[in-house]
């Protein structure tokens, strides 16, 4: 009799233990995972700072941020010519090594409410191309919708070389036809406006008082020049549809 009672007690204890353990196990499986209390470390993506061109002229300094991400060929060409690290040929065909192309060149064409144009070693806008022509680089999200755009002049698609222009106002009619490779700051736009309102020869829009580029310094990793404003209040009705081409016009 005692053996039977002992056996019954043991079985009861085993059943109770199984029931309790089963509840605990079932509960732990159904419970949601506890959120981690470890602090999340933010991931920082490195963004390379854009180079800046500081253009010293006889009437003041211009500062323009370059866009190598939008126009890598154009920016590399401009930097190479500005610093003399790229070979080029002068108007008589002599190859230049280690000589900055833009030093002592003039802004040969300036038009009020439009732009100033330079970068031709011949100083006329129709000199021979100092470097081989290269293709346009046009980004759909980079437009002539603000003043101060720095872009290449051309004689049609894919004829960029050394000549460039800086806009005084928004020039939406140029969208899609020219390589924008930089943005100049507000002080530069003010200086551009001063230049475009100089007295010019009506035959070629060249200032009677020469505006010369003394030197261009490239500062790597500088700050970004912000657009000088929004679209112009009135269109540049006196300006031609496009900046003058280099050698083909």
Which role does the model predict for each range below?
Residues 1-11:
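Bacterial N-terminal signal peptides that target proteins for export
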Residues 12, 20-249:
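Cyclophilin-like peptidyl-prolyl cis-trans isomerases
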């Amino acid at each position: 009799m005692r053996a039977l009672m002992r056996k019954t007690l043991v079985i009861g204890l085993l059943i109770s233990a199984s029931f309790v353990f089963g509840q605990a196990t079932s509960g732990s499986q159904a419970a949601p995972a506890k959120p981690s209390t470890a602090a999340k470390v933010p991931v920082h993506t490195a963004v390379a700072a854009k180079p800046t061109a500081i253009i010293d002229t006889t009437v003041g300094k211009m500062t323009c941020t370059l866009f190598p991400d939008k126009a890598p060929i154009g920016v590399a060409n401009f930097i190479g010519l500005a610093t003399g690290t790229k070979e080029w040929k002068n108007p008589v065909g002599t190859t230049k090594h280690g000589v900055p192309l833009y030093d002592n060149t003039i802004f040969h064409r300036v038009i009020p409410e439009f732009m100033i144009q330079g970068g031709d070693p011949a100083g006329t806008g129709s000199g021979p191309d100092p470097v081989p022509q290269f293709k346009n680089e046009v980004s759909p999200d980079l437009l002539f919708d603000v003043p101060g755009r720095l872009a290449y002049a051309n004689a049609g698609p894919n004829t960029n070389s050394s000549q460039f222009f800086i806009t005084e106002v928004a020039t939406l009619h140029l969208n899609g036809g020219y390589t924008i490779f930089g943005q100049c700051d507000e002080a530069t736009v003010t200086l551009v406006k001063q230049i475009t309102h100089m007295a010019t020869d009506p035959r070629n829009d060249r200032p009677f008082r020469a505006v010369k580029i003394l030197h261009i310094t490239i500062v790597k990793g500088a700050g970004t020049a912000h657009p000088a404003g929004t679209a112009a209040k009135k269109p540049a009705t006196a300006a031609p549809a496009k900046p003058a081409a280099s050698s083909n016009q």
